[in-house]
Amino acid sequence: MVKETHRFEPFTEEPIRLIGEEGEWLGDFPLDLEGEKLRRLYRDMLAARMLDERYTILIRTGKTSFIAPAAGHEAAQVAIAHAIRPGFDWVFPYYRDHGLALALGIPLKELFGQMLATKADPNKGRQMPEHPGSKALNFFTVASPIASHVPPAAGAAISMKLLRTGQVAVCTFGDGATSEGDWYAGINFAAVQGAPAVFVCENNFYAISVDYRHQTHSPTIADKAHAFGIPGYLVDGMDVLASYYVVKEAVERARRGEGPSLVELRVYRYGPHSSADDDSRYRPKEEVAFWRKKDPIPRFRRFLEARGLWNEEWEEDVREEIRAELERGLKEAEEAGPVPPEWMFADVFAEKPWHLLRQEALLKEEL
């Protein structure tokens, strides 16, 4: 449990970092997380990576039609999930956040059901893959248009303030979203209203193929917070503890009524932007290899090993548990069966109007 706040200064020139490349502790305060918590963070990162790998298998075997690889984002996404109160606070995610969804507690059956458009999908197969949502966990259904979820996140946070619920809205997005008008409008309004919101940029340096340095003249995305009059934090997003502590501090700051923050978590996506992208056309292999050496999972593994919290036997046990969970979740999603065609007419009106009833009848005749 985090015992203090205000540990970090905003607008630093270098990313905030707590774990060194060899796993050494760099913090100027004592680590106050218990061993089981640290192990859970690592397990969730492994699960996120293994889920990402399973999604790749789904696309290559023709079982789904689209994926947005997130390998390299694990530390950032798991940290966000652990920094909030699941099922109480709200999350407004973006399309690469399946690791965040899993760490938050969305069942694998639902995640796979959404990817396969089976009856296991709470959205009833109406969204394209990589667009999960969870009413139970206050996980806003992913929206495709870039940054379009930022104004709703601001609005939700304002309502939380007016109703004095004590909740916080956390909104995530990629670096490309920061070039959209909705992004500026949403954060500006949240700042003006002093809303309990935390806006988190998972900056992987590319908006599909466009280098973020070609999108903005601002030295960092965190620096954009100056325009809104809110604090902006630049963080090594491949450092799970730095990401956790900074996001946690921003969340609790918002919960105390001190307004929103902007957090830039610098990460690197190891795969293409999506299954429809060839990243070799715009990223040199040497660049990818450089960032591979900074993989957040081995880095945190070294940190745990130095504290006697990791060994190869424990790692294999954890991997086997995750493999079994993935197999079970996928099996349950597939066995749920495809969504029936008539579901497309449900949940549109409280009472179906005549024209929908007529269309439904015509469809049944054709089938």
Swiss-Prot record:
<comment type="function">
    <text>The branched-chain alpha-keto dehydrogenase complex catalyzes the overall conversion of alpha-keto acids to acyl-CoA and CO(2). It contains multiple copies of three enzymatic components: branched-chain alpha-keto acid decarboxylase (E1), lipoamide acyltransferase (E2) and lipoamide dehydrogenase (E3).</text>
</comment>
<keyword id="KW-0560">Oxidoreductase</keyword>
<dbReference type="GO" id="GO:0003863">
    <property type="term" value="F:3-methyl-2-oxobutanoate dehydrogenase (2-methylpropanoyl-transferring) activity"/>
</dbReference>
<feature type="binding site">
    <location>
        <position position="95"/>
    </location>
    <ligand>
        <name>substrate</name>
    </ligand>
</feature>
<feature type="binding site">
    <location>
        <position position="144"/>
    </location>
    <ligand>
        <name>substrate</name>
    </ligand>
</feature>
<feature type="binding site">
    <location>
        <begin position="144"/>
        <end position="146"/>
    </location>
    <ligand>
        <name>thiamine diphosphate</name>
    </ligand>
</feature>
<dbReference type="InterPro" id="IPR029061">
    <property type="entry name" value="THDP-binding"/>
</dbReference>
<feature type="binding site">
    <location>
        <position position="66"/>
    </location>
    <ligand>
        <name>substrate</name>
    </ligand>
</feature>
<keyword id="KW-0786">Thiamine pyrophosphate</keyword>
<feature type="binding site">
    <location>
        <position position="175"/>
    </location>
    <ligand>
        <name>Mg(2+)</name>
    </ligand>
</feature>
<feature type="binding site">
    <location>
        <begin position="204"/>
        <end position="208"/>
    </location>
    <ligand>
        <name>thiamine diphosphate</name>
    </ligand>
</feature>
<feature type="binding site">
    <location>
        <position position="273"/>
    </location>
    <ligand>
        <name>thiamine diphosphate</name>
    </ligand>
</feature>
<dbReference type="GO" id="GO:0009083">
    <property type="term" value="P:branched-chain amino acid catabolic process"/>
</dbReference>
<dbReference type="InterPro" id="IPR001017">
    <property type="entry name" value="DH_E1"/>
</dbReference>
<keyword id="KW-0460">Magnesium</keyword>
<feature type="binding site">
    <location>
        <position position="204"/>
    </location>
    <ligand>
        <name>Mg(2+)</name>
    </ligand>
</feature>
<dbReference type="Pfam" id="PF00676">
    <property type="entry name" value="E1_dh"/>
</dbReference>
<dbReference type="GO" id="GO:0046872">
    <property type="term" value="F:metal ion binding"/>
</dbReference>
<feature type="binding site">
    <location>
        <begin position="94"/>
        <end position="96"/>
    </location>
    <ligand>
        <name>thiamine diphosphate</name>
    </ligand>
</feature>
<protein>
    <recommendedName>
        <fullName>2-oxoisovalerate dehydrogenase subunit alpha</fullName>
        <ecNumber>1.2.4.4</ecNumber>
    </recommendedName>
</protein>
<feature type="binding site">
    <location>
        <position position="206"/>
    </location>
    <ligand>
        <name>Mg(2+)</name>
    </ligand>
</feature>
<feature type="binding site">
    <location>
        <begin position="174"/>
        <end position="180"/>
    </location>
    <ligand>
        <name>thiamine diphosphate</name>
    </ligand>
</feature>
<comment type="subunit">
    <text>Heterotetramer of two alpha and two beta chains. Directly associated with ODBB in the E1 complex.</text>
</comment>
<comment type="similarity">
    <text>Belongs to the BCKDHA family.</text>
</comment>
<keyword id="KW-0479">Metal-binding</keyword>
<feature type="binding site">
    <location>
        <begin position="128"/>
        <end position="131"/>
    </location>
    <ligand>
        <name>substrate</name>
    </ligand>
</feature>
<dbReference type="InterPro" id="IPR050771">
    <property type="entry name" value="Alpha-ketoacid_DH_E1_comp"/>
</dbReference>
